[in-house]
């Protein structure tokens, strides 16, 4: 007996390892290296294509709670992340090359996982299968899925540029974490005064963008979690100053004042020789990226080792298609996992892979599938993507808004987060004891 897993991204890797850890053989299909998508840069598995940040570590935060739940479910990728984390204040950021290498080595060294490096164009019939083909599902498989379900939605994600550390002019920058969190040098901050910001802003909104297929270049449909900086800027001159360039919590030690606007740079790898432009996912043409981003004083001589790109993203109308256990409503041997289900974010995708893998095993063993309690973050996201009352389905990442309200809701935001997390982890522990 074996279970098929299609795709070796974050969700597929988690699903495969959950299945193998239960003693069931896995046939894992991955089209790389024979075929790649526009956003992929390597032949490795679990490739992080948008950012190297896995979001907040604090268990009292929604993102931190999600990761703690994953740890308690024996997450393979959380172990990989912990082994290659880089300083990032209160966030868990990783060296993405090492992260993908660890994931790839773990998968390929597992005796129960047989990897087939080939493109899948049709989902195997009469076999238990987890489809984790991702937001960059190949066109033949995407078309097969569309024919199977009659509808799907598409939009675009964007990735931020990366510059070399040595090309950052520290005469115009300073090291600090917002509100003095972390070790103090986790971020390089590139301040701008009002005049510099206005010059940059006007250049940004008028810069030429790369062409997109099946999408309006001037106003593409994008999701908030990875919105191109030029699209965000179109909303108004102050939008960036209240978004990725917000100066709050930062004081320029050279002036003693808070800057008008700040671009933060975060370490891309453990070596600290590359930095990514935080929140600056973009679809500008490469020469335009060089021209516009070099208007930021600290980046006037920046060496761009990778320019930002924008790529297609496809997801299901999951409330009409999936159950909360990630199985298809009319086919309990077929599961979907990852961003194709409408969960938004790296760890959210990985978490859905954990659940799909567990439930695929339970079907193989003749057991009933499980859904975690809806007061856990993973359980709440599982409920969200399968909520048939949702009329216009949009992707969702971890946030406390998807959880049931607290009985005694603290007024203080931090206390409220701690209460949500304490309740969730207690609920998860109790649930896991009974299965």
Segments from the language model and where they lie:
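Dinucleotide-binding Rossmann-like beta1-alpha1 core, especially the glycine-rich loop
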Residues: 47-57, 82-98
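C-terminal auxiliary extensions adjacent to catalytic cores
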Residues: 393-435
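Predominantly flavin-linked oxidoreductase catalytic cores and closely associated redox partners
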Residues: 109-266, 271-286, 290-291
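Beta1/beta-strand and adjacent pyrophosphate-binding region of the FAD-binding site
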Residues: 1-11
């Amino acid at each position: 007996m074996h279970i098929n897993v299609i795709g070796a991204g974050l969700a597929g890797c988690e699903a495969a390892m959950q299945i193998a850890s239960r003693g069931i053989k896995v046939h894992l299909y991955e089209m790389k290296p024979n075929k790649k998508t526009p956003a992929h840069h390597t032949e490795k598995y679990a490739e992080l294509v948008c950012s190297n940040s896995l979001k907040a570590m604090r268990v009292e935060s929604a993102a931190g709670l999600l990761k703690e739940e994953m740890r308690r479910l024996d997450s393979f990728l959380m172990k990989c992340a912990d082994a290659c984390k880089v300083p990032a204040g209160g966030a868990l950021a990783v060296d993405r090359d090492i992260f993908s290498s660890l994931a790839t080595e773990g998968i390929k060294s597992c005796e129960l996982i047989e990897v087939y490096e080939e493109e899948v164009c049709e989902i195997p019939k009469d076999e238990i299968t987890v489809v984790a083909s991702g937001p960059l599902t190949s066109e033949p498989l995407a078309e097969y899925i569309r024919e199977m379900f009659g509808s799907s939605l598409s939009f675009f994600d964007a990735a931020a540029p990366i510059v070399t550390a040595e090309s950052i002019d520290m005469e115009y920058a300073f090291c600090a974490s917002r509100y003095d969190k972390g070790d103090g040098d986790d971020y390089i901050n590139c301040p701008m005064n009002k005049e510099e910001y206005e010059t940059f802003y006007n250049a940004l909104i008028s810069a030429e963008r790369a062409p997109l297929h099946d999408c309006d270049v001037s106003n593409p449909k994008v999701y908030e979690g990875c919105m191109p900086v030029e699209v965000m800027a179109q909303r108004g001159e102050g939008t960036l100053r209240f978004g990725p360039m917000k100066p709050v919590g930062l004081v320029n030690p050279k002036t003693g004042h808070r800057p008008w606007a700040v671009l933060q740079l975060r370490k891309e790898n453990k070596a600290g020789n590359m930095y990514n432009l935080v929140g600056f996912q973009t679809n500008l043409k490469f020469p335009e990226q060089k021209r516009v981003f070099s208007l930021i004083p600290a980046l006037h001589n920046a060496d761009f080792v990778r320019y930002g790109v924008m790529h297609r993203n496809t997801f299901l109308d999951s409330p009409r298609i999936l159950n909360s256990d990630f199985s298809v409503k009319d086919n309990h041997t077929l599961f979907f996992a990852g961003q194709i289900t409408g969960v938004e974010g790296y760890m959210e995708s990985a978490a859905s892979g954990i659940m799909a893998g567990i439930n695929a095993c339970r079907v193989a063993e003749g057991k009933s599938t499980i859904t975690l309690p809806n007061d856990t973050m993973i359980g709440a996201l599982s409920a969200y993507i399968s909520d048939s009352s949702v009329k216009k389905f949009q992707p969702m990442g971890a946030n406390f808004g998807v959880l049931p309200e607290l009985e005694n809701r603290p007024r203080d935001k931090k206390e409220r987060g701690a209460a949500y997390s304490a309740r969730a982890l207690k609920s998860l522990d109790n649930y896991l004891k009974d299965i």
